Regions:
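Residues that scaffold the ATP/ADP-binding catalytic core of kinase and kinase-like folds
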Residues: 16-17, 51, 91-95, 130, ...
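Acidic, PIN/NYN-like endoribonuclease modules and their adjacent C-terminal/linker elements
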Residues: 1-3, 109, 114-143
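Short, well-structured N-terminal submotif of metal-dependent ribonuclease cores
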Residues: 1-41, 54-70, 141-143
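A short acidic, often aromatic-flanked loop/helix-cap motif at beta-alpha or helix-coil junctions
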Residues: 46, 88-90, 140-143
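Active-site neighborhoods of divalent-metal-dependent phosphate/nucleic-acid chemistry enzymes
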Residues: 2-3, 50-56, 64, 75-120
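Alpha-helix capping/helix-boundary segments
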Residues: 13, 44, 88, 107-108, ...
Length: 143
């Protein structure tokens, strides 16, 4: 039986797809992946919603466009959005006690470990010493 690799996408992967000059390797990774192998965290949705709210202050029309895109992500990933469960929170607590780390990135990494996913991110420096399978598509298209 073949085990299918599954991926947890960091918020920076999602945001990259909105850029006018998005990194080709990121787009290639996403287009070459089976959609059902890609997962999101509720934390990424929260970060994106925060961005929408902040953008509303300076550019309401752009904010509405981004909000529509975020709503589309939520719909498209509906059965592949992971919450922060007890095991992920406990692992995050252990890792955070080792040294200061960004909360959301470390929670995402813990979620990836608990659910046996490869964490796809550009922010590898804060988690490189952790037992997390990581893929940085800015550097390489596949693990």
């Amino acid at each position: 039986m073949t085990t299918r690799i599954r991926y947890l996408l960091d918020t920076n992967i999602l945001s990259e797809t909105r850029k006018k000059r998005a990194e080709e390797r990121v787009l290639a990774f996403l287009s070459n992946s089976t959609p059902t192998s890609l997962y999101l965290s509720c934390l990424s949705l929260g970060e994106l919603k925060k961005g929408v709210a902040l953008k509303m202050k300076s550019d309401p029309s752009a904010s509405k466009a981004i909000a529509g895109w975020v709503d589309g992500l939520e719909t498209n990933f509906a059965d592949r959005i992971l919450g922060v469960d007890t095991e992920s929170a406990k692992l995050w607590g252990e890792w955070s006690a080792q040294r200061p780390r960004p909360v959301v990135d470390t929670l995402l990494a813990a979620t990836a470990v608990v659910h046996d996913l490869v964490f796809v991110t550009r922010n590898v420096s804060d988690i490189q010493d952790l037992p997390v399978k990581v893929l940085n598509p800015w550097l390489n298209a596949r693990e």
